[in-house]
Curated annotation (Swiss-Prot):
This is Male-specific protein scotti. It comes from the Eukaryota. Residues 55-93 are annotated as: Disordered. Keywords: Developmental protein, Differentiation, Glycoprotein, Spermatogenesis. It comes from Drosophila melanogaster (Fruit fly). The lineage of its organism: Eukaryota, Metazoa, Ecdysozoa, Arthropoda, Hexapoda.
């Protein structure tokens, strides 16, 4: 911009140096300022130096959209909403809820051969589903699908 006005920065630096030589200065022009102003100016410059020397934040490699050492990023394959896997809720991953009688029947049937399980199941229910074990039907399902 100084070139547009007909002079450049080099000429201004020469003028400052000539002025320093006439005044027998060291060339830093800091001796004309008071001590407080000097320290304040150094502090501002130090802060500016820190800001200018700071790396770019965030680093460019973090965002793949800007490209990187491997070239431009590939487009992601669009997935159908219906084919994406979703985590199952905890209630579906657990065993279904059942009454105490059914739990004990299931546990007992593990020790019986497969061809005898149907008969064993019926006999177990007849023997154990009594009013002594379940007074007034307490603990049994009241309607189909309750447990």
């Amino acid at each position: 911009m100084d070139v547009l006005h007909g002079h450049d920065l080099y000429d201004e630096q020469l003028i400052d140096r000539v002025g320093d030589a006439v005044n027998e200065d060291a060339g830093d022009d800091l001796d004309t300022l008071e001590d407080g102003q000097q320290q304040q100016r150094l502090g501002v410059n130090r802060q500016m130096d820190i800001l200018l020397d700071a790396p770019q934040e965030p680093p460019l490699g973090v965002f793949p959209a800007q490209g990187g050492p491997n070239g431009p990023p590939r487009r992601r394959k669009k997935r159908s909403f219906y084919t994406m896997t979703k985590p199952t809720p905890p209630c579906q991953s657990q065993e279904p809820e059942m009454c105490l009688l059914m739990a004990s029947v299931t546990r007992a049937m593990r020790h019986v051969r497969e061809d005898q399980r149907g008969e064993y199941f019926a006999n177990y229910l007849v023997e154990n589903m009594t009013s002594q074990n379940y007074p007034n039907g307490m603990g049994l399902p009241q309607h189909w699908g309750q447990f």
